[in-house]
């Protein structure tokens, strides 16, 4: 039984890793553009993601206030996604922000941006605002 449990755990771990993805700069820029993000703002979005999650869909971060940030955009569970903790304004389970399909992540990030602009993200405020942004023009 112990061997079976170990094998099962290994299979589950492989599957969980298979769902996670680290995007490249251009791959992310194209995904954002294909989901309605204006090309003029792509450098800001790419910079945000680079500094929030290092382009990883599986990124999580526990905050001092007890909340958690999820996924490539580091979307917080106190307001935006459902983990049994907060208001879930994006109407999405936080765990769905950790897979390699970022369509729903982008939809939620657009809502956050609509309400608060890029200032909703400390990664953008601290590393992108007023600074040299990534060039994504060669991606298209």
Curated annotation (Swiss-Prot):
Any single biological process term in GO: killing of cells of another organism
Tissue: Expressed in salivary glands and Malpighian tubules.
Upregulation: By bacterial infection, expression significantly increases 6-12 hours post challenge with bacteria.
Catalytic activity: Hydrolysis of (1->4)-beta-linkages between N-acetylmuramic acid and N-acetyl-D-glucosamine residues in a peptidoglycan and between N-acetyl-D-glucosamine residues in chitodextrins
Protein species of origin: Anopheles gambiae
Keywords: Antimicrobial, Bacteriolytic enzyme, Disulfide bond, Glycosidase, Hydrolase, Signal
Signal peptide: 1-20
Record's protein name: Lysozyme c-1
Residue numbers annotated as active site: 52, 69
